[in-house]
Amino acid sequence: MREIPPERIELLSRIEPPAYEVSAVDSAPSSREFRAAMEEYRKRNYSGAIAGLRAAAAAQSKSVEASFYLAICLLMTNERSGGIQELQAVIAGGSTPYLEAARFYLAKALLADRNIRGADVQLRVIAEMHGKLEKQAQTLHAQIVPTP
């Protein structure tokens, strides 16, 4: 793998939190904790959203929505290892509306941890999914992995 300067890693691994959109798949009534947490998330109060999202994720174990936004909040508050764990749980949930984005944010978090190989794997999988993040994944991949 290519040696990437720390300041370049910091730039490439920076995330822009996704907007919250109600998913048709997660159309089950959301908990009061989840709704309150997502109000904090919308206000960009990521640390204020964490407790409610943790409670919602525990209460709705079959829904990955709370886990996904919890992961984003953890990443935004520099709790990278917790964010990585939550993203891995979302990915383990299989084919959901959050799968591609979870892989993308996981790639960014792994890159921030200087785990270039792990980021490489996630970005390749995203490209193979041919979803809406395909081009972004290919662009980021080209910047971290040398072309043969």
How should these model regions be labeled?
Residues 27, 61, 95-97, 131:
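Short coil turns that delineate tetratricopeptide repeat
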Residues 1-65:
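Juxtamembrane extracytoplasmic segments of single-/few-pass membrane proteins
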